[in-house]
């Protein structure tokens, strides 16, 4: 009877429940379900057994388009030249999104919208009708900043052409040059487009001259647009259709699919962005990874339109997403550049070459503010690293700050963006050390070792005798700026141990200059000083150059002659004196007074570079004495003095977590 009542309540409540939340009551016997796959799409929070009419119409249109009418392209530009705004206009033009209400649709991260920059390469599929025929266009909005070069390089692998976008008011900038050569090296068809031609400060003729002289590109058919107002934007897509070649692929061959990117979804798990080179992929198929050898069943396939839109199939030439059911158990299984094929064809299909692993150039240590939150921080880092494989992570421990991570990034902006994402997307409260660069130790035995953690630097006299030399990384920096700031830029580069490589004028008033600089100086706010010295008109790009021998030392902070491991850096000897004085002065501000004297020192080996002293609290031991009792007065003062000596010898300085947090804050 009780079971019937429960069943009656459940049936009466069923119409008010969402379809996906329906569950049989516990009084029902358990059944064995046949695990078979279908192309039915499961949406979390609701059930969708049949596609909507809009989805069916979209799928029919895509199915009718042959690979010869596919176009995969990206937008190449310097940061802030209008890539994301132009992407919005193209999406509106093709009816992918509604017009008038969008701003940087493909900038999906909070940090991207706050900073006004693109951090992650985002993709979107569009259908464009040209001369009575549908074309399937796949657009990639790439980052412009040098720190996200790995994102740009991966994006180019899925494209056949690129829009070379140049701000008509600023002209060719440093990262325009760098991104151009990256696209040119991959054989992409380049289409020059001038943006912001509606601005009063725009000079299209000068910008076209710079493009022609710098890149040797025919600018006669360059398109001049204003992405903000939509001026002449309809002329862009016909140029893309005519100039960008169709992708090469065969849907009848066995599946050959490249993993381009991945991200984490709290419901679906790891989602993969893929480019299908041959064959086709559907829900229910079993795939195998060439890198790991692991097998997975496909749960769903689809395209970004501009959000995840499920499809029945992805064909050769398409770029889309897939996720597995059951999903990947560990985020590390998603190897960027991996090739997937169907189980049984792994000996027939040749794996694709993949991508070159980017090298970390800047390292920081990250610790949770509260030691109890270490596991939460670890989970948060793993989820973000899944979406950015250029980051390296190693666990480490500090006596002062507890368990944490040593993390490597491609640059200081890359590090700063990751820090913002940790705080905003995962609510992490963290302490992060200032960025440092790796050094190479060449031993007298001939062996070489890359040191990324200052704690492992050979500083002891006995170990130092075995070292032949210590080398630091140099980078080749490309600077573009107006001619009037030439003197200030040269002065800044020379002050940072730079060596001039070349200087040329690509117009009468614009200079391109190349310098070799130590990477350690570049990450020490060099770009901020450059912007300040040129009133914001200079731009910068850099690439790896070489390792050079130098007088590299380890600077440590000592508190009562005990080293504080959380405040240690490897640097050139020329920086030591200035940095040491900054450290001791700043650290003194954040350490509480004790009953004994606290000595704060900056040291290189046994040599003290700078010192500050925090005086102890003073206790008036003479308060109860008569003024005439001189011998008693002297005896009590001597006793107090001896007591302070003992305290200083055995007393442990208590430095609170918040002191480190304040000291390490930017």
From Swiss-Prot:
Q: How does it sit in the membrane?
A: Peripheral membrane protein
- Interval spanned by the transit peptide: 1-44
Q: What class of enzyme is it?
A: hydrolase
Alphabetical GO CC annotations of the entry are: mitochondrial inner membrane; mitochondrial matrix
Q: What is its EC number?
A: 3.6.5.-
Annotated keywords: GTP-binding, Hydrolase, Membrane, Mitochondrion, Mitochondrion inner membrane, Nucleotide-binding, Protein biosynthesis, Transit peptide
Task: Please list the coiled coil stretches.
Answer: none
Query: Reaction catalysed by this chain?
Result: GTP + H2O = GDP + phosphate + H(+)
Query: What disulfide bonds does the UniProt entry report for this chain?
Result: none
Q: Which GO molecular function annotation, any one, does this entry have?
A: GTPase activity
What are the subcellular locations of this protein?
Answer: Mitochondrion inner membrane
| Coarse class of the protein's main subcellular location | mitochondrion
- Record keyword Ligase present: no
Family membership: Belongs to the TRAFAC class translation factor GTPase superfamily. Classic translation factor GTPase family. LepA subfamily.
Outline what the protein does: Promotes mitochondrial protein synthesis. May act as a fidelity factor of the translation reaction, by catalyzing a one-codon backward translocation of tRNAs on improperly translocated ribosomes. Binds to mitochondrial ribosomes in a GTP-dependent manner.
Record's protein name? Translation factor guf1, mitochondrial
- Native organism: Penicillium rubens (strain ATCC 28089 / DSM 1075 / NRRL 1951 / Wisconsin 54-1255)
Species lineage: Eukaryota, Fungi, Dikarya, Ascomycota, Pezizomycotina
Q: Which gene encodes it?
A: guf1
